[in-house]
Regions:
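Beta-strand-turn-beta hairpins that frame and shape the catalytic cleft
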Residues: 26-36, 152-165, 222-225
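Short, flexible loop/turn elements at secondary-structure junctions
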Residues: 40-46, 157, 168-171, 231
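Charged, low-complexity C-terminal accessory regions
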Residues: 114, 118, 124-206
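Core catalytic region of metal-dependent phosphoesterases/phosphodiesterases
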Residues: 29-147
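Charge-rich, low-complexity terminal tails
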Residues: 116-124, 129-132, 250-269
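Conserved beta-sheet core of the metallophosphoesterase superfamily
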Residues: 70, 163-164, 170-266
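A generic local structural motif
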Residues: 23-25, 55-56, 103, 152, ...
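Acidic, histidine-bearing metal-coordination/catalytic regions of metal-dependent phosphoesterases
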Residues: 1-39, 47, 152
Length: 269
């Protein structure tokens, strides 16, 4: 990947909106695969944000040359009129959240490891009330592709290419099986090697096996597809989830390995 140019925060630079995010990934040293961490729902500024755990994962990616796809809701962005009480309880105001998030992600962007940045419904709060797209501003400042709230991706690893449909999502599912069902339903309409779905604050990877016919070889073949829930970084105690009686969920981000010597994907959650 070409390394982006980081501009000082406050310098206006138009974020580049892409419809097809075509990226060449670098394999791990002496390994036949490239790795991608799907990182989202940080909610920086929220009183229960587990920022240190997020920093650990991002530092690990930086030190080990792991690519990162940003899945939205990176900032809490509590504003007047938004759902919930975070406009009163957030630890930083939205401007500080925006600046701290750019500072947090700049080393990865400078290293050319950020594949793209999605907006989420929390960033979208500002757009709905002012027309200012803070997610696009973050992408422009970092010099990475802005993927809106959903985007097709092609990840090229060696001679292999993988299709990934990534999105922030909008499901109100409460339990892991209903969260996975909501993401799996999307796979019925988007034929991709990976469906990556954020927003539901859980980490999971589900494999779908499908049959199809290879017309050239005249035989039945099996295809493996992944549905991935891309995690979060919010503690449970005194959280919205606890207040609503939702079960505690796994904190963190899933990591996928995309192989270069065969068409295969492994997951680590």
């Amino acid at each position: 990947m070409k390394k982006p140019v980081i501009v000082p925060f406050g310098t206006m630079r138009k974020g580049k909106v892409v419809k097809l995010n075509d990226q060449r990934l670098t394999c791990q040293p002496k390994k036949p695969y490239a790795e991608v961490l799907f990182f989202g729902d940080l909610h920086l500024g929220h009183p229960t944000c587990l920022l240190e755990k997020a920093k650990e994962n991002l530092d690990y990616c930086l030190n080990n040359r792991i690519h990162v796809l940003l899945m939205g809701d990176l900032i809490e962005c509590g504003i007047t009129g938004s759902v919930g009480d975070s406009v009163y309880t957030q630890k930083l105001n939205p401007q500080e959240q925006l600046e701290d998030t750019v500072e947090l992600l700049s080393p990865l962007a400078q290293a050319g490891l950020i594949l793209g940045l999605h907006g989420g419904n929390h960033e979208d709060r500002v757009f709905k009330t002012t027309g200012i797209n803070v997610a696009k501003m973050m992408a422009g400042t970092l010099g990475v592709p802005y993927l809106h709230q959903a985007c097709w991706n092609i990840f090229r690893v060696g001679k292999q290419s993988y299709t990934v449909y990534s999105m922030h999502g909008a499901s109100g599912s409460r339990f892991i099986y209903t969260k996975l069902k909501a993401a799996t339903d999307i796979s019925h309409y988007f034929r991709a090697d990976v469906i990556a779905h954020a927003h539901v604050h859980d980490v999971a990877a589900h494999t779908i096996e499908r049959q199809s016919i290879n017309k050239r070889m005249k035989k039945i073949v099996y295809e493996k597809h992944y549905v991935v829930l891309t995690g979060h970084y919010l503690g449970y105690q005194l959280s919205y989830a606890q207040m609503k009686g939702m079960p505690p969920s796994h904190v963190g981000s899933p990591k996928l390995q995309f192989f270069s010597d065969r068409h295969d994907i492994h997951s680590s959650t």
